């Protein structure tokens, strides 16, 4: 019996190793195809969904799901750098998430502070001259979180490499409201009346006051977890974005899933409403 169990374990190890080797080979093939095609998003949007469900499926505390999700964000940043994607926005925390249980929200904000401090000294950020910006409404964040985000932004402010936007306290409708308010304040500072401000209002005028106005609109947006909805992510900018919905939870998002999504994007014909 012992020898039979040993043989079964050996066979299982062989099957696992074989599957791993096949997946690795497939991943390398995908990477070559994506690189050879050369058509990559100028601005990639990532909706990081499924942290809590990942933890629940694995029998873990939900806080662990957020921790694994933070680790995955570091991996995906590396994949973007390897491919030379110019700009990426990752949606970490929505305005609606602010209504979650205090203990969970405190854990997420603590993670955000930790990750911001780590990114500020991450050799990859400085070697690749990645400019990092936190976008969203942060007025209600704890002072130590705000300090960490401000330090990260200041330490990369002069860089002209990849642009990385971390959307925290972010909502698409709130962004549009903020943009309109900013536009009106600018018009008032220039001495315009309300009637003149209304006459001057155009889509481009609002676009100039969005959080990432100096970057191209996202041309490709990936959402994990199998949920097929937009949830207000970059509402104004995503009018012509291509979407890809991936069935895996964010912490389980693999490089092969990332490459499959990009290959799908490369096969699409973007018509921009025409």
From Swiss-Prot:
Question: What are the recorded Gene Ontology BP terms?
Answer: polyprenol biosynthetic process
PROSITE patterns for the chain: UPP_SYNTHASE
Q: How is the cofactor bound?
A: Binds 2 magnesium ions per subunit.
Q: Can you tell which superkingdom this protein's organism belongs to?
A: Bacteria
Cite a single Pfam family from the UniProt record.
Prenyltransf
Q: Keywords on this record?
A: Magnesium, Metal-binding, Transferase
Positions bound to Mg(2+): 49, 242
Give the molecular function GO annotations: magnesium ion binding; prenyltransferase activity
Q: What is its EC number?
A: 2.5.1.-
What job does the chain carry out? Answer: Catalyzes the condensation of isopentenyl diphosphate (IPP) with allylic pyrophosphates generating different type of terpenoids.
Note the subunit structure.
Homodimer.
What's this protein's family per the entry?
Answer: Belongs to the UPP synthase family.
Name used for this protein in its record: Isoprenyl transferase
Species of provenance: Deinococcus radiodurans (strain ATCC 13939 / DSM 20539 / JCM 16871 / CCUG 27074 / LMG 4051 / NBRC 15346 / NCIMB 9279 / VKM B-1422 / R1)
């Amino acid at each position: 019996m012992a020898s039979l169990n040993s043989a079964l374990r050996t066979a299982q190890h062989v099957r696992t190793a074989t599957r791993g080797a096949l997946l690795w080979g497939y991943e390398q093939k995908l990477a070559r195809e994506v690189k050879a095609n050369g058509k990559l998003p100028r601005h990639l949007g990532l909706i990081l969904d499924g942290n809590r469900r990942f933890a629940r499926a694995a029998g873990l505390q939900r806080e662990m799901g957020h921790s694994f999700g933070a680790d995955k964000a570091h991996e995906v940043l590396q994949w973007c750098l390897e491919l030379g994607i110019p700009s990426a926005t990752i949606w970490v925390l929505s305005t609606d998430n602010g209504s979650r249980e205090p203990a969970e929200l405190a854990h997420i904000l603590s993670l955000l502070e930790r990750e911001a401090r780590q990114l500020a000294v991450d050799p990859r950020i400085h070697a690749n001259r990645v400019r990092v910006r936190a976008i969203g409404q942060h007025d209600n964040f704890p002072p130590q979180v705000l300090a960490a985000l401000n330090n990260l932004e200041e330490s990369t402010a002069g860089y002209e490499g990849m642009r990385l936007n971390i959307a925290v306290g972010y909502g698409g409708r709130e962004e549009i409201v903020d943009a309109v308010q900013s536009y009106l304040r600018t018009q008032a500072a220039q001495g315009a009346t309300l009637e003149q401000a209304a006459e001057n209002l155009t889509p481009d005028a609002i676009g100039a006051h969005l959080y990432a106005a100096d970057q191209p609109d996202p041309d490709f947006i990936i959402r994990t977890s199998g949920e097929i909805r937009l949830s207000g992510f970059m509402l104004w900018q995503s009018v012509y974005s291509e979407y890809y919905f991936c069935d895996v939870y964010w912490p389980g998002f693999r490089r092969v899933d990332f490459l499959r999504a990009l290959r799908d994007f490369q096969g699409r014909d973007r018509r921009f409403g025409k």
